[in-house]
Amino acid sequence: MKVKSFAKIDLGYSVYKKQKNFTKHDFESIFILVENIYDDIEITKIEKNIDDVHYYNETNEIYVYSRLVHKTLEWIRHTYHIKNHYRINIKKRIPIGAGLGGGSSNAAAIMKYILEFEGIKEINYKDVVNKLGADIPFFLSGYKTAYISDYGSVLEDLTGQFKLNYEVYLMNVNVNTKIVFEKFDDNSWHVIKNNFKTIIKNLKENIVVNIHNDLQEYCFELYPNIKYKYNELLSDGFYTILSGAGSSFIRIKLKNKEDLIINEN
């Protein structure tokens, strides 16, 4: 079976300091599905006692360090008492380390297909967040736009509630998300700048203003080339902001315009 695994952008990103005895950061954001950037995934049940996962680009097999797909398959078997193993072939088009949620999208697409195939409808988002990742519930939800809170486990559907004309600028930089968060954690002083209730109200009125990404300055410190490109991209009529921990940018223009992907070679 073949399925598509879509990217997403994070419009605004408020990150909270870790609470005592917590290993994850709470956060707030607006996630938007990007349906013209996607990976193709082929899923086949196999008669083996081990999963067989491979990644490809347009021409060759590639090595991907993340074991999130393996962890997801193990979580499915443990949680739902499914014994099957699978061959997973993933053709990557979503850039790795781009702040577009590619790994989480892959995990969610595979989980969604297997659970539907097995007739399972119940998914505990909090368990998914705790065991696998904060972005996965959004990709499972079927929402095209959502306000995300409570470590990624609570989603408010915003699909169709505002029209946003934007460009996604893809840089050829693989950002290490873990290091960006470590840089964020090193700073003991942090002020939350986003008011998402106000942001959502403004977006419904076609107003894009005062939207911030708390990780942006830390990404720029670690990757000066990304900051340099950000300064280049700032221009009249566009609101430019980093997606996630980077390296992609969202450029928002309020005039009617089809979504556009700009690639940096």
UniProtKB/Swiss-Prot annotation:
The protein's name is 4-diphosphocytidyl-2-C-methyl-D-erythritol kinase
Q: List the disulfide bonds.
A: none
Q: Which reaction does it catalyse?
A: 4-CDP-2-C-methyl-D-erythritol + ATP = 4-CDP-2-C-methyl-D-erythritol 2-phosphate + ADP + H(+)
What InterPro entries does UniProt report for this protein, alphabetically? GHMP_kinase_C_sf, GHMP_kinase_N_dom, IspE, Ribosomal_Su5_D2-typ_SF, Ribsml_uS5_D2-typ_fold_subgr
- EC category: transferase
| GO molecular function terms attached to this record | 4-(cytidine 5'-diphospho)-2-C-methyl-D-erythritol kinase activity; ATP binding
> What role does it play?
Catalyzes the phosphorylation of the position 2 hydroxy group of 4-diphosphocytidyl-2C-methyl-D-erythritol.
Keyword list, A-Z:
ATP-binding, Isoprene biosynthesis, Kinase, Nucleotide-binding, Transferase
Q: Which domain of life is it from?
A: Bacteria
- State the family named in the UniProt similarity comment for this chain: Belongs to the GHMP kinase family. IspE subfamily.
Give the SUPFAM superfamilies listed for this entry.
GHMP Kinase, C-terminal domain (SSF55060), Ribosomal protein S5 domain 2-like (SSF54211)
**Organism taxonomic ancestry:** Bacteria, Bacillati, Mycoplasmatota, Mycoplasmoidales, Mycoplasmoidaceae
Report the leader peptide range.
none
What is annotated as the active site?
A: 8, 135
Q: Which GO terms describe its biological process?
A: isopentenyl diphosphate biosynthetic process, methylerythritol 4-phosphate pathway; terpenoid biosynthetic process
Q: What is its EC number?
A: 2.7.1.148
